[in-house]
Amino acid sequence: MNIIETLEKEQLRTDIPDFRPGDTVRVHVKVVEGNRERIQIFEGVVIGRRGRGINETFTVRRVSYGVAVERIFPLHSPRLERIEVVRHGKVRRAKLYYLRERVGKAARIKEER
């Protein structure tokens, strides 16, 4: 194992729950406003994960007041307070980019039993 891999391994978080694309997650993010720090919750559907190790990211999509918002979160970021899995969705794709074209009920994902 080289030096870079050793340093990256120390930075990896161990408190990350098991979640996949299609799952609905609630991400608690630390937001700094001026000299204050608060927790902001972003809840939505995971539409993709990419990368490995310290560079791994995941994309969460939600529709708020008719406007779709997608945020990309680094999985091992110290800004993430915690990730809660709200429900597990049943999908057959690794990337759910097709949901961007779907509106309303067509954008729903079946719940895994």
Swiss-Prot record:
Signal peptide: none annotated. Pfam families: Ribosomal_L19. Keywords: Ribonucleoprotein, Ribosomal protein. GO terms for biological process: translation. GO terms for cellular component: cytosolic large ribosomal subunit. NCBIfam families: rplS_bact. Belongs to the bacterial ribosomal protein bL19 family. This is Large ribosomal subunit protein bL19. It comes from Moorella thermoacetica (strain ATCC 39073 / JCM 9320). The gene is rplS.
